């Protein structure tokens, strides 16, 4: 299992969704930018907290996937199933090891990282993946970059920084208590 020795980690992320340039355009078009922090713990727990441009928090507590949107004052709760397994955070930190779901193909060095191409394995739920291809950028034995190409041509670029591994995370880290008056949607 890739990153087998990493039981938990926390750090910061920046994320961009871009569209490749159309004919006549010189640069890719940035569709969306965000940044925030992440925490994960195996098996199956993570927090992906967006702080900019707006506050949102995605929490996988091992059983459920919770999406907290501060601006909407809304918490959506759903079982941790297919929706979780296809998220970028779950690809890196999920219950199923990245090398069990993807064939890892050496891709060379780019941007100070050693890249591995991610090719979904046909027998590991590739049909459930919204990504046609991707890559993970490694530095010092840790994933620090992720590039995912979806079936519509959009590219998601994620950079991880200030990573701390195997720290002493308390059990309360993955518990979320919504503020009073929040709308709660339970989706089955």
Each model region followed by its residue ranges:
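Short helix C-cap/helix-to-loop transition motifs enriched in small/turn-promoting residues
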Residues: 9, 41, 45, 66-69, ...
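A mature extracytoplasmic/lumenal domain signature
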Residues: 15-17, 42-44, 50-54, 62-64, ...
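Structural motif
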Residues: 44-45, 64, 140-145
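Acidic/charged, solvent-exposed loop-and-adjacent secondary-structure segments enriched in E/D, K/R, S/T
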Residues: 67-93
């Amino acid at each position: 299992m890739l990153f087998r020795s990493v039981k938990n980690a926390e750090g910061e992320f920046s994320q961009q969704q871009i569209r490749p340039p159309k004919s006549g355009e010189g640069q890719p078009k940035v569709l969306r930018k965000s940044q925030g922090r992440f925490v994960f713990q195996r098996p199956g727990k993570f927090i992906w907290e967006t702080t900019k441009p707006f506050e949102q928090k995605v929490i996988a507590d091992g059983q459920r996937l919770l999406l907290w949107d501060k601006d909407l004052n809304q918490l959506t709760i759903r079982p941790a199933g297919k929706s979780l397994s296809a998220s970028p955070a779950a690809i890196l930190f999920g219950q199923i090891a990245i090398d069990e779901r993807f064939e890892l193909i050496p891709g060379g060095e780019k941007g100070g990282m050693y890249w591995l191409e991610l090719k979904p394995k046909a027998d590991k739920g590739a049909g459930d993946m919204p990504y046609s291809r991707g890559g993970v950028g490694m530095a010092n034995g840790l994933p620090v970059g992720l590039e995912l190409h979806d079936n519509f041509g959009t590219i998601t670029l994620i950079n991880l920084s200030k990573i701390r591994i195997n720290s002493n995370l308390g059990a309360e880290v993955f518990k979320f208590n919504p503020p009073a008056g929040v709308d709660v949607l339970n989706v089955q």
